[in-house]
Amino acid sequence: MKSENLVLREVPATKYQIDRAGLIGKEIALYKDGKLVVKDKLIMVSAPEHSPGVIGLYFDEMPTATIDRSGVFTIKYMARTRTAS
């Protein structure tokens, strides 16, 4: 029997930089100083050619809040994990 569990993960990120693994189509919430500034569904992750180590996040809607891009953010997202039993 398979079941899906939602696991809350916290990933430190700067200027929307984040590891690309397993985030496409997931809803993520971006927090700064304890305030939710944007929560949306991630539709694409890209690594610019001029900066291979930098990951860009693209959402299905633009964030409506003003974000201090010089700060360090924590991105919290619900990742689905499957367990077989």
Q: Which ranges hold each PLM region?
A:
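Short beta-strand-centered aromatic/proline hotspots
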Residues: 38-46
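Short coil-to-beta-strand transition motifs
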Residues: 31-39
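Structured surface patches comprising rigid loops and adjacent beta-strands/short helices at the edges
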Residues: 67-81
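Short acidic, Gly/Pro-enriched loop/turn segments at secondary-structure junctions
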Residues: 51-52, 78-85
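Mixed-charge, Lys/Arg-rich low-complexity intrinsically disordered regions
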Residues: 2-21
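Basic/aromatic-rich interaction segments and small domains that mediate binding to polyanionic partners
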Residues: 45-65
